[in-house]
């Protein structure tokens, strides 16, 4: 843990500006792009399959986000996922809305089988992915899925599928955030309730992880960094603002500012049940 914290402190500033290919939903597209820019990366937001052959030769990592799914978006995600598997491109799959429709479930499972580096979602989405029940409606997580016993069940279920998803890092976000890889797990507990009140915070976590994968960071460390960085940024933003729109803007502002001082990482809260 101590060595990982030292590594997390040293990640920013990035030593190079990686090119990050994002196939994401158009609702949060600008937020995702700005998150990558503020970290020091360069986003390219392309879902046109005609460009993939060229882009896969020049980009450093790939973000696949299932939000606002339609037939064209599904085709882009599916093709990019297969290409990423063939080319061993570092990839984050964000299972937005997994399990709420057959289309999302089939697509999410297909992308998961293509050996992504990281699979993420909120606790309810990841519960459905491993076959556990969830009371969540739509793309928002259910509070009942975030109780201690529910998280214990989720961690156990994720560890049980590691033979099928060897080395893949699973990230489940919520009031407590869970990271699982093979037989190890971690629970983080920073953050504020206001993060659930504006669209795109989960997408931002995916963007941060992908940016760090693009500069060669270890996916386990990158996932810890991404969750903690956003949550600590939100804690700082809440202390400086009143009103949700001001809070939303300040979170993005803190994505830019927070990493200029390595001491932000001393605020990371590791948790048990």
UniProtKB/Swiss-Prot annotation:
Signal peptide: none annotated. It catalyses: 5-(2-hydroxyethyl)-4-methylthiazole + ATP = 4-methyl-5-(2-phosphooxyethyl)-thiazole + ADP + H(+). Pathway: Cofactor biosynthesis; thiamine diphosphate biosynthesis; 4-methyl-5-(2-phosphoethyl)-thiazole from 5-(2-hydroxyethyl)-4-methylthiazole: step 1/1. ATP binds at residues 120, 173. Its EC number is 2.7.1.50. The keyword Ribonucleoprotein does not apply. InterPro entries: Hyethyz_kinase, Ribokinase-like. Its cofactor is Mg(2+). This is Hydroxyethylthiazole kinase 2. It comes from Leuconostoc mesenteroides subsp. mesenteroides (strain ATCC 8293 / DSM 20343 / BCRC 11652 / CCM 1803 / JCM 6124 / NCDO 523 / NBRC 100496 / NCIMB 8023 / NCTC 12954 / NRRL B-1118 / 37Y). The gene is thiM2.
């Amino acid at each position: 843990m101590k060595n990982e914290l030292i590594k997390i402190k040293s990640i920013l500033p990035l030593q190079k500006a990686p090119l990050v290919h994002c196939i994401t939903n158009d609702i949060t597209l600008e937020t995702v792009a700005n998150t990558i820019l503020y970290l020091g990366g360069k986003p390219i937001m392309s879902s046109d399959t005609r460009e993939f052959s060229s882009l896969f030769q020049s980009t450093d990592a790939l973000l696949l986000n299932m939000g606002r799914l339609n037939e064209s978006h599904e085709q882009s995600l599916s093709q990019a996922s297969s290409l990423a598997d063939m080319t061993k491109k570092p990839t984050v799959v964000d299972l937005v809305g997994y399990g709420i429709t057959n289309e999302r479930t089939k697509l999410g499972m297909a992308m998961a089988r293509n050996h992504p580096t990281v699979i993420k979602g909120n606790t309810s989405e990841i519960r459905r992915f491993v076959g556990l029940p969830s009371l969540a409606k739509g793309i928002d997580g259910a509070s009942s899925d975030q109780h201690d016993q529910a998280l214990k069940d989720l961690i156990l279920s994720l560890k049980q599928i590691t033979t099928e998803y060897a080395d893949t890092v699973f990230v489940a976000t919520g009031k407590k955030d869970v990271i699982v890889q093979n037989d190890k797990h971690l629970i983080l507990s920073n953050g504020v309730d206001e993060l659930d009140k504006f669209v795109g915070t989960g997408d931002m976590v995916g963007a941060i992880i992908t940016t760090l994968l693009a500069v060669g960071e270890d996916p386990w460390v990158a996932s810890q960094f991404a969750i903690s960085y956003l949550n600590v940024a939100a804690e700082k933003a809440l202390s400086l603002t009143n009103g949700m729109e001001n809070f939303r803007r300040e979170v993005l502002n803190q994505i830019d500012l927070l990493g200029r001082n390595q001491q932000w990482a001393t605020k990371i809260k590791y948790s048990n049940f």
